[in-house]
Amino acid sequence: MDLITNIQKYSIHDGDGIRTTVFFKGCPLKCVWCHNPETQRFEQEIQYDAEKCTGCGVCAKVCPNGAVTMEDGRPKLDKKLCKLCGKCENFCTQGIREIVGQEYPVKTLVKELMKDLMFYEQSGGGVTLSGGEVMAMSTDYVLAIAKALKKEEVSLTIDTCGYVPYEKFEAILPYVDTFSMGNVGGTAAEIFYKNGQKVVAVSGHCTSIS
């Protein structure tokens, strides 16, 4: 199942009105200017706030796989040994370690998104699917979310780099109100522009490219 790193409520910069933004984990690009670098990899991973770490070493002591060691008073993680058991997260005295990326069944996710329906209706807002790259996720999963929101008459925006096969857009177009496509460069630019042109041509007024 695809992974989600965060469900951000009361977003006002990810589309019209007040929105709930869902950040998916995984992106085919590795832009150095990425706003959400923790969402680039498709797998779960451990992250921690180095500035708040006291160097107590508890994480290294409780790790059953020897994945965390202390070097110069700071914890170092060997990702090859880490099994994502969560013990370092649970025992961290400062509460600054976490496993990034959680699974959400469609019904569970939609139920959470519908909690803010009142704000969507009063502000002309809705839900934004972002990332990472939401269009790189399983088409069936994203499509199920989009259909469920459409059934509830919730406006849906998809924030995408466009760097995926056009067939993925084709499947979800009937259920999306707006595509927000940021400009990209390098090898991704040609695919971005081709997909953007096709999306606008097919959807007309209901889709915007920004």
Regions found by a protein language model. Name each.
Residues 1-3:
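Extreme N-terminal starter segment of soluble prokaryotic enzymes
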Residues 5-58, 75-84:
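N-terminal pre-triad scaffold of radical SAM enzymes
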Residues 7, 25, 37, 79-80, ...:
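Fold-independent oxyanion-binding glycine-rich loops
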Residues 15-16, 23-24, 41, 45-46, ...:
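N-terminal-biased segments
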Residues 21-23, 69, 128, 157:
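Short, conserved beta-strand segments within well-ordered enzyme catalytic domains
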Residues 32-39, 58-77, 87-102:
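Iron-sulfur cluster-binding cysteine motifs and their immediate structural context
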Residues 84-88, 150:
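Short, compositionally biased strand/turn segments
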Residues 107-210:
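Conserved AdoMet/S-adenosylmethionine-binding subsite of the radical SAM
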